[in-house]
């Protein structure tokens, strides 16, 4: 089945109107109306800002079951296809080959990395007076720029308004990045689908009972949302007493290299109704024309179709 974390919003036909139109609905609502195709696993969708982005379309063009093999043979290598079922109905869906798209994307644009490092850390310095705190169930995490990252459990004290942090662990302390040499040594620049992020490591945390080594946390600073407020967007213990944390820095969004690429056009997922034989009750074009149209790189335009009001 689809996962709400994989498809937070899909563009789908509206229901209960005289015409089919496209609209954006929360997945929790549209999930009742979508057949169980496992496109989430096929497309490896992670979040709303993942690349490539997708839009979903129902086509009013029906295809003959006997034409499917021919369509598959003619489909561009940048596209994949699958058959799916919803009750008694069969659908043929054409969707992008996400692996090829990512392989062909520019993951490391040409930038002056040292200049990018300087510009980026200047924006991160704006967190100097910011205290970030994130509660994740039993544990709470906080980040203080230039100082540390901590993990602790907040325990209310009986008969008092005070809350005790017990236990508390320092996951890592900030390195010295004041000199140019330290700046280069302690700040790494990475790219994910052409978007830059800065990364550093806070070391010398509380000693770990399991590894017998000090805890450490890898911090990634990026423009990860459209929010004007800095926030901890991701946290994970990747191995015993080794952690990763991602922090959204609004200032980085003003730098082109770090900015979310919202203007990237979405890749289409188009599904067609499959029929056993030609019928006057459906909109079915000349068989060979349909084969060529469905197999082409750009799926056919979805038209407005008159429907009965429910």
Curated annotation (Swiss-Prot):
Location of the region described as Disordered in the Swiss-Prot/TrEMBL record: 282-310
Range of residues in the leader sequence: 1-40
UniProt superkingdom: Eukaryota
Chain ranges of the MRH domain: 129-255
Membrane topology term: Peripheral membrane protein
GO biological process: endoplasmic reticulum unfolded protein response; retrograde protein transport, ER to cytosol
Positions of a mannooligosaccharide derivative binding: 139, 151, 209, 215, 237, 243
Residues with glycosylation annotation: 60, 97, 104, 204
UniProt keyword Glycoprotein, yes or no: yes
The name this protein goes by in its record: Protein OS-9 homolog
